[in-house]
Amino acid sequence: MASYPDVLKVAQNLGGSKVLGEDVASVADLERAVGRGLPFAALKYVVRHFPQRQKTRVQQIVVPRSTLQRREEEGRLRPAESERLERIARLATLAEQVWESPEEAQRFLTAPHPQLENQAPIDLAATDLGTRRVETLLWKLEHSLPV
């Protein structure tokens, strides 16, 4: 049922080629970029699309508060941090596809959801399994399947 959302839109949600420093035209391209570590600017780009009260929450899913300044100085995230950021961008892309509105997508991502044990979808992006749960829910909503 689930497939990867449009990789170009995911890359765009990470800041596009201007922020990423390269063109991302396939999942393989994105995988290589994540494996090298995404630019810190991609985190800033993703975070600025969330409501002010959620920005710190999103940052902490990607990078612990104690490490944030160091990553900013280095200018690059570690691969594991990049994976978490990619998951957030992927969920945002899929939510925007389902809700057809960036505002509605952000509302969905940051509000507790009963099908996710009253956890906010964005909080589940910290792990691959949590992300899969959110993706499954979004695909069911997209295809009008029972949730």
Model features per residue range: what roles?
Residues M1-V147:
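Non-transmembrane "mature" sequence context
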